[in-house]
């Protein structure tokens, strides 16, 4: 308290400006955040200088040296002093110039920030200079050495020991250099693709070894050829050019746009995207590049829309995307983030509408193409169909006019998908029409025969009182499923009782249950009439008006007359579960029970009994009583406060699965599973356990499946099948480096490679063995997925998604099944295994393994 008073009486500290050196260091750390940012700034400077040849050299992935050389215009001598000073630039002069800026850089912060974070040396030669100049700068951006340096026109910037002035960041940078390097190459790929007519190359040197090329483009004026230079010609074969279409009315309505908005041609989109055929996409989003006015950026909404539309046609893969969005510079704000990759757009909804309509149109036309295989085909009888080259070259439109017969392969060898869809839609519409009872069926299946037998037998079993009309109220196949087996299967899956309600309102009770009437239902057309069927138990018949029933007991002097209560006219309500024998009594049973009750009451007589009571004095103190009451009240409040804190509040329902899992992860540790007490097994599928006052239910199959799955993940070494000839992989230099560094992980997954150190980069690794397991086969696409996973977490044991699916299938088959009776030791073993798992809360297929049922303390309190 005294400290607080003394601090409040101290005079407020004066507000003073931070010294320029500290400001420079603080702000520089916010401009250059990573290796990719540093390389990006240097490459953009070269592009802004009009270079046609950019060469990037790295040492030890960029830890020791980053050097970018270009053949641009160079720097004039009068600009040497301001070259690395904060907010010194030749791109803009005032804020209004931002709306018209066409260069990558405009803030004048990049070189100044690099000087603050590393040792920077620049050599440059302008066209007007006779000889080049080499400049060395201090951390404040001041020139400390200036010497003549012979070189051709252009500029070379060398950055040594990046982040050396920030010890913590420098240590983190060195520790994660592989991940930083992979991100840098991803960023560099974007500039290689979009820089038409510019040759870009990158090499990396490890220690004193030779330089290894990372990426290289040939300076082609075409973006398509740049894609081939970076990712190989195989990638080009799976791409289709982007075709822009005006937004459709339905898409405009989805985005809340009017028809007049759709007429504005604000955007022009060009580029390439993967075909939607399964197998040509990617297993991840590692090759998606977006540009706005040829500036690489990360438009989150555009990226999400492209992937969502692609998943409508190929839900298991991601597309390769290169899209450039051209728009008036006045509609764009690029001054949002330090790296300029977050860009704000006017009329963004219109862009999304154009993009969605165009993608749907492209993929629809791609899906409707039927590729004709060159392999020999078989007709219905199994004979070979000879395919002529002239027939294969015929367009689809011509072939639609030919005979519709598919049996004669000579006359028609190609069918339009649209005609197939039309045929299938006609088939489904005819099948879904309700059949008339009088319409004969030419081919009745066994199921249809059963349904017909059920209709006839049901009609015959009903009495002749006009209870059920044959055409309207009989159970037939035209009014939904009525097969007893079908009905039983539906009820078994739904988990309801055995009474089923037909579409006409009839209730069919379980044959095992006993009720007073076999059918009690009202017709939809006449709800006032009542139908009665003979009782299975041969109970006495009651009059339709529910008249009085005279019941006589065995004793002559005692008689009783009772009125039977009217029963509901329709027992087949949707809530009807099951008929039980003891719930419905006949009138004679009711009469007999009441007579017995009267006999018992008549025989009971009250007798007065005199009891001698003893009087004992008792010490009593009002103060002690009040004290005890106060103490009990305090204890009750304390216990109530403890009970109010409930560890588990989530319900057992699919909507709260995530909340329940979070609660379990928070409150249950791995050691607690061994402390749980086994209560028993429920329904041959669940284990009931107790931990302190909490009761849990555990899915015996799901928990055993997850344990087996994790054991397979950790310890299984897949056996590989050697290939007849080594297979060349279409890998980039970065992906090839990741593969070589993680060969042991690939071998544990069943892949094996031969590495040729003397071969050119991107061709050093060749696949010689693939994992095989019964009916599971794997290929190069699984190698790509594993490389992508290892790029984010190098050295960590990873499994491709298809290997995980195989392990999940195996774990499911070898686990304890639902319906298996377990003894206490077996149940204890399953619960103990949960404490040995990394993620015990879900099975490999996503089903929950454990849920909280109740707290005994809360139940006893209530």
UniProtKB/Swiss-Prot annotation:
Changing residue 511 to A: In LYNCH4; benign; normal DNA mismatch repair activity. Coiled coil: none annotated. The keyword ATP-binding applies. Changing residue 705 to K: In MMRCS4 and LYNCH4; likely pathogenic; loss of DNA mismatch repair activity; decreased protein stability. It catalyses: ATP + H2O = ADP + phosphate + H(+). Changing residue 107 to W: In MMRCS4; decreased DNA mismatch repair activity. Changing residue 470 to S: In LYNCH4; benign; no effect on protein abundance; no effect on subcellular localization; normal DNA mismatch repair activity. CDD domains: HATPase_MutL-MLH-PMS-like (cd16926), MutL_Trans_hPMS_2_like (cd03484). Changing residue 41 to A: Decreased DNA mismatch repair activity; loss of ATPase activity. Changing residue 853 to M: No effect on protein levels. Belongs to the DNA mismatch repair MutL/HexB family. This is Mismatch repair endonuclease PMS2. It comes from Homo sapiens. The gene is PMS2.
């Amino acid at each position: 308290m005294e400290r607080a008073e003394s601090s409040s009486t101290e005079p407020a500290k004066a507000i003073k400006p931070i010294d320029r050196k500290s400001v420079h260091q603080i702000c520089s750390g916010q401009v250059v955040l990573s290796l990719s940012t540093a390389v990006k700034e240097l490459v953009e400077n070269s592009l802004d200088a009009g270079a046609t040849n950019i060469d990037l050299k790295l040492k030890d992935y960029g830890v020791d040296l980053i050097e970018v050389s270009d053949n641009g215009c160079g720097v004039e001598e009068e600009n040497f002093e301001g070259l690395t000073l904060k907010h010194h630039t030749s791109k803009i002069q005032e804020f209004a110039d931002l709306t018209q800026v066409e260069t990558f850089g405009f803030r004048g912060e990049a070189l100044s920030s690099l000087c603050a974070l590393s040792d920077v040396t620049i050599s440059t030669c302008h066209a007007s200079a006779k000889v080049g100049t080499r400049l060395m700068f201090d951390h404040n951006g001041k020139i400390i050495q200036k010497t003549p340096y012979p070189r051709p026109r252009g500029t070379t910037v060398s950055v040594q020991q990046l982040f050396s002035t920030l010890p913590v960041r420098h240590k983190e940078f060195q520790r994660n250099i592989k991940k930083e390097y992979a991100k840098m190459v991803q960023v560099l790929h974007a500039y290689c693709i979009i820089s038409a007519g510019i040759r870009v190359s990158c090499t990396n040197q490890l220690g004193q070894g030779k330089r290894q090329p990372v990426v290289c483009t040939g300076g082609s004026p075409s973006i398509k050829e740049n894609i081939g230079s970076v990712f190989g010609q195989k990638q080009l074969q799976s791409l289709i050019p982007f075709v822009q279409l005006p937004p459709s009315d339905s898409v405009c309505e989805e985005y809340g746009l009017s028809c007049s908005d759709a007429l504005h041609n604000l955007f022009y989109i060009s580029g390439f995207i993967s075909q939607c055929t399964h197998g040509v996409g990617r297993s991840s989003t590692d090759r998606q590049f977006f540009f706005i006015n040829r500036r690489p950026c990360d438009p989150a909404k555009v990226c999400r829309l492209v992937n969502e539309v692609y998943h409508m046609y190929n839900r298991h893969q991601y597309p390769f995307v290169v899209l450039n969005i051209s728009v008036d510079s006045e509609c764009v704000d690029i001054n949002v983030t330090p790296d300029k990759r977050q860009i704000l757009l006017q009329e963004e909804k219109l862009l999304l509408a154009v993009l969605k309509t165009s993608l749907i149109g492209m993929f629809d036309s791609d899906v409707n193409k039927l590729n004709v295989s060159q392999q020999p085909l078989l007709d219905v009888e199994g004979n070979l169909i000879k395919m002529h080259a002239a027939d294969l070259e015929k367009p689809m439109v011509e072939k639609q006019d030919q005979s519709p017969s598919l049996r004669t392969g000579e006359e028609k060898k190609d069918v339009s998908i649209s005609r197939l869809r039309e045929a299938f839609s006609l088939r489904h519409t005819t099948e879904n029409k309700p059949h008339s009872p009088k319409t004969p069926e030419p081919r009745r299946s066994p199921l249809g025969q059963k349904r017909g037998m059920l209709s006839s037998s049901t009609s015959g079993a009903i009495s002749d009182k006009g209870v059920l009309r044959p055409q309207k109220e009989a159970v037939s196949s035209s009014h939904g499923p009525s097969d007893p087996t079908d009905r039983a299967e539906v009820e078994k899956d739904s988990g309801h009782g055995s009474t089923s309600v037909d579409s006409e309102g009839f209730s069919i009770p379980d044959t095992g249950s006993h009720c007073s009437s076999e059918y009690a239902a009202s017709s939809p057309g006449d709800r006032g009439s009542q139908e009665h069927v003979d009782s299975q138990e041969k109970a006495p018949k009651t009059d339709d008006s529910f008249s009085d029933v005279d019941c006589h007991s065995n004793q002559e002097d005692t008689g009783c007359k009772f009125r039977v209560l009217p029963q509901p006219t329709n027992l087949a309500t949707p809530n009807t579960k099951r008929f039980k024998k003891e719930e419905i009594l006949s009138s004679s049973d009711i009469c007999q029970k009441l007579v017995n009750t009267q006999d018992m009451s008549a025989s009971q007589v009250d007798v007065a009994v005199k009891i001698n009571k003893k009087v004992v004095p008792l010490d009593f103190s009002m103060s002690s009583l009040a004290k005890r009451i106060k103490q009990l009240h305090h204890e009750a409040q304390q216990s109530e406060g403890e009970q109010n804190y409930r560890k588990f509040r989530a319900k057992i329902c699919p909507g709260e699965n995530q909340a329940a899992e979070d609660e379990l992860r928070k409150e249950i540790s791995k050691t607690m599973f061994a402390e749980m007490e086994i209560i028993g097994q429920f329904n041959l599928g669940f284990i009931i356990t107790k931990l302190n006052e909490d009761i849990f239910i555990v899915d015996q199959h799901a928990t055993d499946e997850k344990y087996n799955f994790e054991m397979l993940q950790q310890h299984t070494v897949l056996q590989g099948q050697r290939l007849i000839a080594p297979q060349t992989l279409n890998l980039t230099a970065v992906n090839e480096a990741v593969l070589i560094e993680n060969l042991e992980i690939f071998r544990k997954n069943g892949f094996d490679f031969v590495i040729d150190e003397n071969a050119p980069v991107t061709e050093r690794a060749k696949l010689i063995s693939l994992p095989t397991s019964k009916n599971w086969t794997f290929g190069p696409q699984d190698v790509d997925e594993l490389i992508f996973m290892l790029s984010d977490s190098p050295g960590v044991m990873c499994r491709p998604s298809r290997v995980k699916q195989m392990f999940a299938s195996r774990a499911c088959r070898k686990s304890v099944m639902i319906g298996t009776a377990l003894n206490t030791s077996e149940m204890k073993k399953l619960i103990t295994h949960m404490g040995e798992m990394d993620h015990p809360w879900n099975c490999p297929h996503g089903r929950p393994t454990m849920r909280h049922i109740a707290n005994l303390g809360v139940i006893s309190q209530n």
